[in-house]
Amino acid sequence: MIVLAGRNLAKMEAAKAELDELGVESYCCKTDIADRAQVQALADYAASLGDVTQVIHTSGVSPSDTATENIIRINAAGTVNMVEAFYPVLAEGGVMINFSSVAAYTMPQTDEWTQAFEAWNEPDFYERLLVLAGEAEDEESEFFRAGLAYAMSKKFVIYFTQKNVARFAEKHCRILSISPGCYLTPMHQKLIDNQPETAENQLELIPAGLAAIVATVVVGFVGGPLAI
């Protein structure tokens, strides 16, 4: 059984239709991850259907999607909402997976960032991160500020995941994060369309290059480095 959650009900229903064809029982629950009450309702709903054994938290936005404020609200504060809401209902032996990004490793974690991260449970947590993102060197570039906010928010995902490892272990559960690199998704396509130079710079960081294209042929389709 799978519970799909997100803001776009049409996309969820399309995914549900595919799961139905595969014989997988699934449900949709429209949820704004940045809204703690909605996330709590999602956790309660999932628990009402049976044991919650796996929580895969993939929600996130990038500078190509939205502005600085929403990046912090969804990526950072949204992660807190998910962890805090699902920790109580996660069944023994369960696992929670949070999606970070390789972007988290492109910026050093300063003392100021650490202090802000440690205030995750304070009322002004969101505002603290917003202030740090506003201290970008190129203050005339909203895209630059949003890029900094993205890296910072994804670094927070790693921080908050690690912070909760022992807590989850106490109930014989696991929590971990993964950090995908650049691959072609609708979100990344927006970056290619709107910021081609930035997208090209990211592509150059993929060491596989042509080998990635060959790899796609091996698995049955022809693509490129961003396709895998």
Predicted region positions:
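Conserved glycine-rich Rossmann-like NAD(P)H-binding loop of the short-chain dehydrogenase/reductase
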Residues: 1-14
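Hydrophobic positions on the long internal alpha-helix
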Residues: 42, 56, 82-90, 160-161
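Rossmann-fold cofactor-recognition segment
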Residues: 19-37
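Catalytic loop of short-chain dehydrogenase/reductase
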Residues: 61-65, 95-170, 182-184
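Conserved Rossmann-fold cofactor-binding substructure of NAD(P)-dependent oxidoreductases
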Residues: 34-51
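Short, flexible catalytic-loop segment of classical short-chain dehydrogenase/reductase
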Residues: 105, 180-190, 194, 199
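C-terminal helical subdomain
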Residues: 81, 149-150, 177, 197-228
